[in-house]
Amino acid sequence: MWNKTRTTLLAVGVLFHLFYLWSIFDIYFISPLVHGMSPYQSTPTPPAKRLFLIVGDGLRADTTFDKVTHPVSGKTEFLAPFIRSLVMNNATYGISHTRMPTESRPGHVAMIAGFYEDVSAVTKGWKSNPVNFDSFFNQSTHTYSFGSPDILPMFKDGASDPNKVDTWMYDHTFEDFTQSSIELDAFVFRHLDQLFHNSTLNSTLDYEIRQDGNVFFLHLLGCDTAGHSYRPYSAEYYDNVKYIDDQIPILIDKVNKFFADDKTAFIFTADHGMSAFGSHGDGHPNNTRTPLVAWGAGLNKPVHNPFPVSDNYTENWELSSIKRNDVKQADIASLMSYLIGVNYPKNSVGELPIAYIDGKESDKLAALYNNARSILEQYLVKQDEVIDSQFFYKEYFKFVEKSHSHYLEEIETLIQRISEGENYLEQEAITLTEELMQITLEGLHYLTTYNWRFIRTIVTFGFVGWIFFSFIIFLKSFILENVIDDQKASPLSHAVFGSIGILLNWILFYQHSPFNFYMYLLFPLYFWSYIFTNRSVLRSGIKEFFKGTSPWKRVLITISIISVYEGIVYGFFHRWTFTLITNILAFYPFICGVRELSVNILWIITSVLLSTFTLFDAVKIEDLNQIHLAGLLIILSAFYALYKIHSRINSYTRAIFAIQISLVAAMLAVTHRSVISLQLRQGLPRESQVAGWIIFFVSLFVMPILHYRKPNNDYKVRLLIIYLTFAPSFIILTISFESLFYFLFTSYMVQWIEIENKIKEMKTQKDENWLQVLRVSVIGFFLLQVAFFGTGNVASISSFSLESVCRLLPIFDPFLMGALLMLKLIIPYGLLSTCLGILNLKLNFKDYTISSLIISMSDILSLNFFYLLRTEGSWLDIGITISNYCLAILSSLFMLILEVLGHVLLKNVIIQDKTKKTQ
């Protein structure tokens, strides 16, 4: 039923949700980046002429320093004995603490630019997107970089002069997760050797390489690849660490012979660690703790503790006698800048770790002071931007109590006194400088969030207005069908809302607000004007909707709905909440009056079994037994369904079903062989990969076409077709229990259809029972969430295991791997859309009734998550709150898509004893 009112709802709804989806990035995650700062040189007397930055991608701190037992040889040993010898004799070491997300791009940005890239970067992509801020490479004389095509280009393309950064990269196809990861690192060392050799044949190159201020960046991807493929406790991962340790002394010897001046500084670290499951991205300590070892020109030798110092994490390192100097990852950029005497990156927030520096205290203090001035420069530029766009400006309270100029004067006075021999003031000067840096960073956050309260109020009115606006349209479309034309707005309404709009738009204009802010304001003005004009429709529609129910029952229904929605909100953070709600729904048929014992018992059993999935760990470990069990259950359930519908199908359809069941069995066999081969480190058999893709394609595309040639329009037949169409694809993409969920989720919805049909048949009144529509909509929306959280959560997707795609795609291909992951996520929604479509037909609901009602209520979730967004703390928490908000705000549109998809999947389907069919 596509009338004017519904068209308005869809057009306004799509625009509203798309704009408000983006609102969090305009409000919460405005980039703190500022431009136009003056640079500050780290030191005029650099201790090193060049620097080698060696990054072991995905290398954990404990693996680097700990004594481990090799899983193949059984030998207990230190994997990196040479690096350990540096720590004990020649280097300063510590743990570099990363921030979340513990991914390659933000990790490298932090250590090379000294800047923790904000979440708004996710809107631009993270691989090929060049960094749009200053970096250590940008300040160097020249940078020679070797390694992965996922990392090197973003610093080359983002440099002020791209010719300043040279890159030597392997092709993406080189990143084969089933082959030896050591080859990736061997490429780096081999091409560095080639560069040195070429310089002996080219005088220009030789001159360029020997310039002061050069940087050599070695990006070693091997550990990350081995960790993803085989876990960080595997022989492959350990062997890769040993290979790196073997190559570093060779590298040092070649560098010393080539330059022959002992003026080279070396930094060895990692961008992030690796979880026990072979993933990273979240805030687990195994992901955030990385090694940092620094040696060479300008760097301190190890300092011995007067007494052994260790903790539970480091007790097996046998380094308790050596002082450990931990840093934040962004501090590495400041350290590297000092070592070769270049400017601090203009956007750096890193603090110079003076414990690593070998030099005069006055030089170190001067460098730290310039570090603080560089950060303060960002604050001053940002403050000027804010002052220029405000009617009234209120300065950050800590700088009101003590101005930044006062801080600078005090520090300069202390530095002057220290230079005159008062060395006892050094610690006071360092403490005061660090205090200035900390307050400056807090002030930057204050300026970035200066207009939060105003714009968040506008967005809140927008969400609440949409809820009432869409509910009024639902009432007009399905309950008060005699209301055709909208009520005319009164002159008072025009005057009031027009005045408010002019005033608020003027404020936005004065604040130099972007275009999106005007749209955020336009929607609440339109919604509340519409609500005010149609307030009589809202009153009469609610009265008709709850016709025949007592006031206390209305209150109970309202409380129940809000409780379910708030439970869903809580379930986004704690999946066990979905278990609780599913178990409560186990009594749903009995509460609604269904008294058939077999129906109720089967429903309770299925509900309890389905509820267990949200208790399982979202990060899964490959389990072939669970995959086998799920495949067997899918095959048995298909045979049982065929037995139940055998009288409704002809021989052609029966033969197609037999082929589909055979494809499920064949895919199970292919999955078994692929898993065994990959677990034995024998790679993916070519024939298994080809067979997997053939079955994948045939089941998803060929079989539906064969059914379409001679269609059977019975709804039970159509549901079985869809169930078997998706099953093979889901099996090969399953890591452990996902296919079991697929089987039980389908069983649950099939039973739900029959239960709702029985409830419908029990009603004798002629009037439309809107409470059943309400119940179906709420349960349907709940199942929309279960379809996602039943097999994982946001965090498990951000760090998904490669087992789910390596059986089809062993070569690294982020686009195709992402597409396969999305297919796996979408399949349960396809089943849900089919069942909602069947419910729509069996219960004689008008088309789009369910989606329209859900759309009017679902933004209860969006409003919750809007205020639950986090900008501080663990980046895992920050990322999850962003994803939760996006999932919630897209639920409205997704529900409509599901119902449209249901119409497509159920085209011409006939419900027995009903004359209605899909159009």
UniProtKB/Swiss-Prot annotation:
Biological process according to GO: ATP transport; cell wall organization; GPI anchor biosynthetic process
The annotated pathway is: Glycolipid biosynthesis; glycosylphosphatidylinositol-anchor biosynthesis
Q: What is the effect of changing residue 302 to L?
A: Induces auxotrophy for ethanolamine
Concerning Pfam families, the annotation shows: PigN, Sulfatase
Assigned EC number: 2.-.-.-
Tell me which UniProt keywords the record has, alphabetically: Cell wall biogenesis/degradation, Endoplasmic reticulum, Glycoprotein, Golgi apparatus, GPI-anchor biosynthesis, Membrane, Transferase, Transmembrane, Transmembrane helix, Vacuole
- Which Gene3D superfamilies does UniProt cross-reference here? Alkaline Phosphatase, subunit A
Q: Oligomeric state and partners?
A: Interacts with CSF1; CSF1 channels phosphatidylethanolamine to MCD4 in the endoplasmic reticulum at contact sites to support GPI anchor biosynthesis.
Name of the protein = GPI ethanolamine phosphate transferase 1
Q: Which organism does this sequence originate in?
A: Saccharomyces cerevisiae (strain ATCC 204508 / S288c) (Baker's yeast)
User: Gene name on record?
Assistant: MCD4
